[in-house]
Amino acid sequence: MPLSRLLINNFRNLQAIDLELSPDFNFIVGHNGSGKTSLLEAIFYLGHGRSFKSHISNRIIHHHAENFVLHSKIDETQHQWSVGLQKNRAGDTLLKINGEDGKKIADLAHLLPMQVITPEGLTLLNGGPSYRRAFLDWGLFHQHLEFYSYWANLKRLLKQRNAALPQVKSYSELKAWDIELVRLAHLVTKMRTEYAEALRPEIEKTCRFFLPELPIRVSFHQGWENGADYADVLRQGFERDQNIGYTMVGPQKADFRFKANGLPVEDVLSRGQLKLLMCALRLAQGEYLVTQKKRQCLFLIDDFASELDPMKRELLAHRLRETGSQVFVTAITAEQLNQMHWQEYAQDKLFHLKEGKLKT
């Protein structure tokens, strides 16, 4: 579901931006500090209620303002949505969808599935397991409406269990938490396992397209020993958990691992190859969403030319075209985009930014 219009007020150095957007490729060009990344960040914020760069609102609001405002129109074949989000320095958020208050960020996220490809996004591969769990859970959030409530309740119960650990004297005092925790852990793990297995061939196929020289293999690890009953694991690990102050094993420790030639990819691949692999993962997941749910996914790509040679850039552009998705790409100059042959497509749009303002 593409954005047809985007208005940004007082978001970082973007004080007043009004864009009529293409449903295909939108290129944002400008020198460092012009606001290119901030524009992508604003779109991301509109779809997630948070930034991919900072969790501190005061760093995002323009220094002369008390709040920032984001507004967009979202077009689908038979529907149109109007979305507005405002955040002030106290951290209060006002969200409206089609003029209605009381909406949740989850409602907005369901409306705007998006994938982000940035230089910092390599943490998906060389960061901790939490980044890869988030990758899986993004897909499940958009595939299964019930997943969000399972996941949120699981997090709540784990937090309560961890808080109770230093206060209880015996395991029997934790059983009330663990009965429900085990149920939710099995539900979340079953959904993650099935989704990971369904996504695996799509990822491996896309990896062969970008990295034919390296066989990439993916595997899901549930967070405790395969075949073991999680209820027994919790009971047997009570003293250990109590000593360290948190629940050591479970779905909160799950991982989705990537290997090349039998070794972790972060130990084998160059930065350029890691970036290609990250692109392949994001593309495969976005394409899988289109196939399974008939829903388009937005792609936000920052610093497009970084660490990719011209041939790989053209390959990425070609695959993005094939998805039929709306794409936002930043680059320092239009020349960096020439490898994509974007001039051939009449619906594409090019925007020039300078010091937070659109150049006309």
UniProtKB/Swiss-Prot annotation:
InterPro entries: DNA-binding_RecF, DNA-binding_RecF_CS, P-loop_NTPase, RecF/RecN/SMC_N, RecF_2. Coiled coil: none annotated. It comes from the Bacteria. The keyword DNA damage applies. Keywords: ATP-binding, Cytoplasm, DNA damage, DNA repair, DNA replication, DNA-binding, Nucleotide-binding, SOS response. GO terms for cellular component: cytoplasm. ATP binds at residues 30-37. One of its GO terms (molecular function) is ATP binding. Belongs to the RecF family. The RecF protein is involved in DNA metabolism; it is required for DNA replication and normal SOS inducibility. RecF binds preferentially to single-stranded, linear DNA. It also seems to bind ATP. This is DNA replication and repair protein RecF. The lineage of its organism: Bacteria, Pseudomonadati, Pseudomonadota, Gammaproteobacteria, Pasteurellales.
